Structures are given as structure tokens and as C-alpha cells.
């Protein structure tokens, strides 16, 4: 059994009831009764007519029991391990005093700077000796005479 919906009121239309209205542009409307059809043809807005489903939806009629059922989901904070650090390590770091953390940070920075200085110091002595040998072997540059072309006469082609 196929049940249609009224295009105006929104009520169900059971088989053997209602009317069909086909507009010239090919759109077909189903109406429950002559009352709905005449209201539609008079271009009345179903949202402003008290007995239609659209009016009841717009003005939130008969939805009081649904409001009680609705429950919103709350976001819950959850602590878990991250790649490369277990939950125990993270909690230990978090529970440390700020002074201890600051001291550790400064020590790590100092160690990194010292390592960088040592790396640069190892690089520097080797570099000047290589440069000195190339400086003595280099010959002075001689300027090449520029080839002067004849002036172009005529257009582009």
C-alpha cells in the first residue's frame, strides 16, 4: 500500500483518497482534499495556516516529549601515551617543578652549543691549509678582448 504526502498540508494520503494536480511545467502535486487544493491554488503559505504540518513544525508544536529524550555527548579528556614517550614519562615531566625543568633545558642548550663549537673548531684548521695551497698556484686573470660585431642595419628580419 503506497501512502502519499499532501503537497500542501503534509498529511498522509491513503489509496483511493485525494486529488492530483499537474501543472503546465510538468510538476505534479498531491492534495488530501479540496480544502488543501483550493488553499494551494490561492497561493496561501502552509507555514501560516494553523492546521498544517509545516505550521506545527515551524512553531514547535507537539515536540515536548522528544526534547526530554535528546542527550548531548560531552567531550571527555583522556590521557594516553604519544609515540616515543610513555604515559609515565609524560606525567613525570609534567609533575616536575619549573626550576628543575628550566635547569635541564639550559643544560641541554649548553651541551648543544659546545658540540657545535667543537665541530666548527675541527673544521677551521683544515680549511685554511687547503686555501693557502690554491692561492699560490693560481695565475692572474687576463682580460679577453671582446669581439665587436658590426652594427645591425635594417629591421627585425
Curated annotation (Swiss-Prot):
Family annotation (SMART domains): TRASH
Record-linked InterPro entries: L24e/L24_sf, Ribosomal_eL24, Ribosomal_eL24-rel_N, Ribosomal_eL24_CS, TRASH_dom
GO cellular component annotations of the record: cytosolic large ribosomal subunit
Keywords (A to Z) from UniProt: Cytoplasm, Ribonucleoprotein, Ribosomal protein
Subcellular compartments: Cytoplasm
Region (Disordered): 94-157
GO molecular function: mRNA binding; structural constituent of ribosome
Keyword Cytoplasm: yes
BP GO terms, sorted: cytoplasmic translation
Origin superkingdom: Eukaryota
Primary residence: cytoplasm
Biased composition (Basic and acidic residues): 96-117
Biased composition (Low complexity): 123-140
Role description: Component of the large ribosomal subunit. The ribosome is a large ribonucleoprotein complex responsible for the synthesis of proteins in the cell.
PANTHER family, sorted: 60S RIBOSOMAL PROTEIN L24, RIBOSOMAL PROTEIN L24
Family: Belongs to the eukaryotic ribosomal protein eL24 family.
Oligomer status and interactors: Component of the large ribosomal subunit.
UniProt name for this protein: Large ribosomal subunit protein eL24
Protein source organism: Pagrus major (Red sea bream)
